[in-house]
Amino acid sequence: MTLDNYNIFNDEYLFGMPLSPLPKVLGTFDGIQLAPTLTTPTLTPTTTRSLQEAFFELTNDPGTPYQATFKPPPLGLMPGGNNGNGVTNVPTTTATATVVGVVNPMISQLPYEVNSALQGTDSDNSNASWADAQNNEDQDTTDTSSAHTDSTSYQNGHMAGSSVNGGGANNFTNVLAGINAGRGSTQGSNTNTSNSATPARRGGGRRPNRNTNMSPEEEEKRRIRRERNKQAAARCRKRRVDQTNELTYEVEQLEKKRDGLKKEMETLTDVKNQLEFFLRAHHSSCQKIRTDLLSVTTCNGLIAPVGLPSAGSCDSGSSSHHNNNSNDSSNGTITGLDASLNSTGRSNSPLDLKPQIKDEPLDGGLDSSCLLDQDGPPPSKRFPLPPMSTLMTPTGVSSGSLQTPIASTAPGGFGSAYPITTTKGSMNSPTLNELNKPKERPNTLAVQRPFVPQMHLNLTSNHNKMPGSGPTHIQGVPIQTPTTGFNFDSLMDGGTGLTPVSGPLVPSQNKHPLELPTPTAEPSKLVSL
């Protein structure tokens, strides 16, 4: 087929016939041109079979050729129409030759009929070659080395009739005949090349090439290698299963150990709680703890060791003879200290805890029987009061009394509104005493001296009483309350300069309620600095 014939074929079959099924068929072939040349991609058994099936399906469509209710007559081979190239020219009828763009539906019969006219071929041999090629394709899935054989088949003159000058229909039948001829010659060349050398693999995957022409030694090697692989895989699976079982057993043992530890912790916690409960219940009635808390053995003001015997100057039993509430540093026991001081850790180096306690004279009016027990809390300390003459300003009156004088009448503010009957029977007679008279502003400050044994207060004496002081005896029994003879200034080492220096209020005799002294009855006497 020349270039002119190729152009004519393209114009007639590809572009001039829109209803023809051939453009669809020829357009789906990957890289296959109509007229094979030296640069044309070669045909393989797979593409040849797909081409044959496509032609068979498209030409056997019953609806396409008979749309115009016209059935062309069948074409037959003419006996004398050989052109010398081994290809018979098929004469066409008048209808098919004169009508442009109509394809004869019986053209599908031409490949099988043309093959019978080829030199040295037969239709039975062609069918057998197709079956053999198909079987060869099933056996060798990776054999794609038919390019050389196909190209040589075209060069050997199997398609010599392609250069015949003729009509478009006759040229197309020649092309189909050449395709079948190339398909028939492919089988013999493929068998020769497969026997000569194993083709290279062009596909991926683990599946090796079919061992159709493999030597027995190679087959034995492959079998041995396959058996070894199977054994290695089985050993690997067994080792993995063994490791899994071992780890599972170890996990079970650890879980059991954890459960045992949890139970042991719970048991120990219960025992601890029970012991703590017993300790709390016994703490209130434990005599040893009470003894350790209340007494610590001392020797010359030092805490003695635990095993030191009390002898000589370290007489711990002499504390029972001293009920004067004084802690002697040379003998006796120190009460109220913590029992932790009497520990073995401090026995080698006792602490020098020598308390400095002031000498406190006893109160003459207090009986020793009123003191609390030695085990109880210590009684409150009592201090003697100095004479009030050192604290009072010289106003010309007796100032040694601690009692506050009581006014015989109410203040002037009350006397103007309410008539008050005094003991003398006179109405609104202001009986002036020393507290109601105006007093001078003091210009000196009395400082209290330290406590001296001579500065004792005798509550039963009468030389420092004022005329209006209250009684200190009730039916011969002295009043011994904590507030008797005390005020705030007597508890300090001197006046603060801001507190009144008058004596404390003492309950008076049966007086009128309006005659009782009030905070506003007299001006406060402040000491100026």
From Swiss-Prot:
It comes from the Eukaryota. It is found in: Nucleus. The modification Phosphoserine is found at S349. Residues 221-240 are annotated as: Basic motif. This is Transcription factor kayak. Belongs to the bZIP family. Fos subfamily. SMART domains: BRLZ. Its main location: nucleus. Homodimer. Heterodimer with Jra. The kay-Jra heterodimer binds more stably to the AP-1 site than either of the two proteins alone. Residues 118-134, 340-350 have a biased composition (Polar residues). Residues 376-387 have a biased composition (Pro residues). Gene3D superfamilies: 1.20.5.170. GO terms for cellular component: nucleus. Residues 118-166, 180-239, 311-390, 493-529 are annotated as: Disordered. One of its GO terms (molecular function) is DNA binding. One of its GO terms (biological process) is embryo development ending in birth or egg hatching. Transmembrane segments: none annotated. InterPro entries: AP-1 (IPR000837), bZIP (IPR004827), bZIP_sf (IPR046347). Developmentally regulated transcription factor AP-1 binds and recognizes the enhancer DNA sequence: 5'-TGA[CG]TCA-3'. May play a role in the function or determination of a particular subset of cells in the developing embryo. Is able to carry out its function either independently of or in conjunction with Jra. Keywords: Activator, DNA-binding, Nucleus, Phosphoprotein, Transcription, Transcription regulation. Residues 247-275 are annotated as: Leucine-zipper. Residues 219-282 form the bZIP domain. Residues 142-153, 182-201, 315-332, 363-375 have a biased composition (Low complexity).
